[in-house]
């Protein structure tokens, strides 16, 4: 199975012609790449993985205290078997926790579980992920994207989300922990899962392995960025499968960079980020 390319974070920050050419070549094929030597401390990642495991080990009645009503899963806990990929009838085999931005008072406030020690530690990871994602977005400005706003600005005070995911042991007749889907947002960053299984589909319809080591971050383009770039940057279908490890839980920590809700993604139709997200939440059974 083919794999995805990798690039140094320092080159993304530099954003020179060679880096842009490298990214354009690969993003047109698979839309995923690995970021090496990023500034996110390994200790921070390990702390949040440990926190995530402790959180999902809580009894269900405790976790359900943090299922926020009428928020469409924007913050807090979402139970196993709720989110369903577009055009699918079988729900993904996962439960998750959403942490949003604290910088925009117009967004829903985060919730913090009383049962956990230092529940605010994930706010620190959120901010560090956000900085890295904005650096990637700034690099994409060099793609000569025809967009009527500053690409670097649209995510400031945006509706971004840090997601802690737990994929329990899978059912023997269902190898898909997360069925094939694309991400709704601008850019997704993902620290490597504790088990393999993430695959992306290239332009030839082949599934490409998207594993990386624990010191690297996987980055992919989301649907909103494809719209903003008028198709220059391609959002990619991907999935999570159980590769012979269905008897073990899998934990994952993706960060989804979103624009502000009022940002217009497509000036031809005046489609806003909020409109697009609202429709997607309906499509995946979260609204």
List the predicted regions and their residue ranges.
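Peripheral, non-catalytic segments flanking oxidoreductase cores
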Residues: 1-287
């Amino acid at each position: 199975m083919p794999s995805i390319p990798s690039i140094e974070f320092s080159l993304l920050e530099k954003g020179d012609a060679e880096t842009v050419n490298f990214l354009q070549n690969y993003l047109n094929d698979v839309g995923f790449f690995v970021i090496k030597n990023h500034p996110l401390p390994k200790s921070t990642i390990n702390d949040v993985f440990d926190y995530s495991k402790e959180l999902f080990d809580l009894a269900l009645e405790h976790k359900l205290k943090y299922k926020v009503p009428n928020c469409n899963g924007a913050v807090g806990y979402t139970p196993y078997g709720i989110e369903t990929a577009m055009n699918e009838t079988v729900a993904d085999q996962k439960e998750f926790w959403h942490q949003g931005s604290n910088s925009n008072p117009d967004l829903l406030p985060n919730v913090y579980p009383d049962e956990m020690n230092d529940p605010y530690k994930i706010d620190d990871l959120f901010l560090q992920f956000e900085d890295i994602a904005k650096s990637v977005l700034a690099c994409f400005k060099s793609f000569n994207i025809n967009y009527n706003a500053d690409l670097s600005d649209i995510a400031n005070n945006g509706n971004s989300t840090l997601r802690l995911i737990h994929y329990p042991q899978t059912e023997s007749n269902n190898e898909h922990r997360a069925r094939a889907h694309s991400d709704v947002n601008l850019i997704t960053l993902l620290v490597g899962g504790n088990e393999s299984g993430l695959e992306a589909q290239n332009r030839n319809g082949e599934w490409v392995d998207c594993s990386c080591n624990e010191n690297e971050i996987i980055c992919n383009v989301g649907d909103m960025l494809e719209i903003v770039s008028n198709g220059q940057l391609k959002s990619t279908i991907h999935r999570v499968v159980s590769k012979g490890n269905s008897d073990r839980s899998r934990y994952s920590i993706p960060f989804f960079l979103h624009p502000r809700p009022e940002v217009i993604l497509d000036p031809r139709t005046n489609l806003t980020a909020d409109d697009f997200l609202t429709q997607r939440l309906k499509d995946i059974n979260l609204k």
